[in-house]
């Protein structure tokens, strides 16, 4: 099935409201607790046109050319109504524009299209995500959102699957959705009001966490050579702290908690003892795996090392894991993404495309 393409639309018809959304998108993208690397997406509806973030773009660079893709809302709705709908069918709903040059829309474009509000903002809010990662933490999430019209959405694959899940759950009054292991979706017909809602949610979530600003542990002096192994030492002491705390190392080696962590870092973060026999050979072998596998390694008690060919955004995603670990109590079991979910993400053409958009060699 191929969705009908609408008539071409000129970039000159972009409304002032879209420019305001781009400014807000950049603001969100510069807040690492809301957005990490190429994650998150925003949109605005103008008539039957949906302007949605292009796949692989960074919200922190929302003022750059071809950040938004124009799409036909009616074509997306027609495509989604068919059980046979695929990602390619959604891509066919792009309104032709000679300046786009094969740019793809965010995989979340269907979700943006089926939500009736003019503006839709989807962030990977780490505080919201943290409170979805354990049954013991869900009461804190419910307390934070008390009095708001909101929906909790159990984890489901991003894209068409998430879109259909929201279709089955939502009603017209729902403006806030909390996605398990994934983030926030906030809707509104007025951008100023949406921003106020986002600010209110931020304060509500902040109230559920104890404020503690601690200096990161300083990694030990690295008196071993990893030159030629395909890895380089990380200079960020916050990131290095992930390798210094046994509980954090164990959690990272068990699996991943967020879809984008899988896409940029692989299924888990391996731990390696720098004093074990064959240490350099082991690193060389690990660095030969297809990306994003083994993008970073925990050197036990010494810090993190990052692959020389790692994707753009790798360091941002590792810092995201530090922020998550810092918020999570040590005594709670975590809801990791299972192997089927991980393989689905790693083998998904839409995510492979996003990875290609974030190769340093480009």
Predicted regions and their residues:
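Glycine-rich flexible loops
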Residues: 1-362
């Amino acid at each position: 099935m191929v969705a009908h393409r609408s008539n071409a639309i000129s970039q000159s018809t972009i409304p002032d409201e879209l420019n305001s959304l781009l400014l807000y998108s950049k603001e969100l993208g510069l807040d690492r607790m809301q957005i990490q690397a190429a994650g998150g997406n925003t949109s605005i509806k103008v008539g039957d046109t949906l302007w949605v973030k292009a796949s692989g773009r960074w919200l922190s660079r929302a003022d750059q050319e071809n950040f938004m893709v124009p799409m036909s809302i009616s074509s997306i709705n027609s495509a989604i109504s068919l059980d046979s709908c695929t990602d390619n069918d959604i891509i066919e709903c792009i309104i032709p524009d000679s300046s786009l040059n094969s740019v793809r829309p965010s995989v979340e474009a269907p979700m943006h299209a089926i939500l009736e509000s003019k503006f839709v903002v989807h962030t990977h809010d780490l505080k919201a995500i943290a409170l979805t990662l354990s049954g013991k933490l869900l009461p804190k999430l419910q307390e934070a959102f008390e009095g708001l019209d909101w929906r909790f959405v159990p984890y489901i694959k991003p894209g068409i699957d998430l879109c259909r899940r929201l279709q089955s759950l939502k009603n017209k009054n729902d403006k806030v959705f909390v996605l398990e292991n994934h983030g926030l979706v906030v809707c509104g017909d007025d951008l100023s009001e949406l921003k106020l809602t986002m600010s209110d949610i931020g304060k509500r979530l902040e109230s559920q966490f104890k404020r503690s600003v601690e200096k990161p542990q300083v990694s030990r002096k690295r008196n071993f050579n990893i030159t030629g192994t395909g890895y380089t030492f990380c200079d960020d002491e916050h990131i290095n702290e992930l390798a210094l705390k046994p509980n954090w190392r164990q959690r990272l080696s068990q699996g991943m908690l967020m879809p984008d962590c899988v896409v940029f870092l692989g299924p888990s973060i391996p731990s390696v003892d720098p004093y074990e026999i064959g240490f350099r050979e082991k690193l060389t072998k690990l660095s030969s795996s297809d990306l994003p596998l083994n993008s970073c390694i925990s050197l036990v008690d010494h810090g993190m090392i990052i692959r020389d060919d790692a994707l753009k955004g790798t360091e941002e995603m590792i810092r995201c894991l530090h922020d998550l670990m810092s918020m999570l109590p040590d005594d709670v079991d975590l809801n990791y993404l299972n192997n089927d979910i991980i393989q689905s993400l790693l083998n998904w053409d839409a995510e492979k495309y996003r990875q290609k958009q974030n190769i340093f060699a480009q």
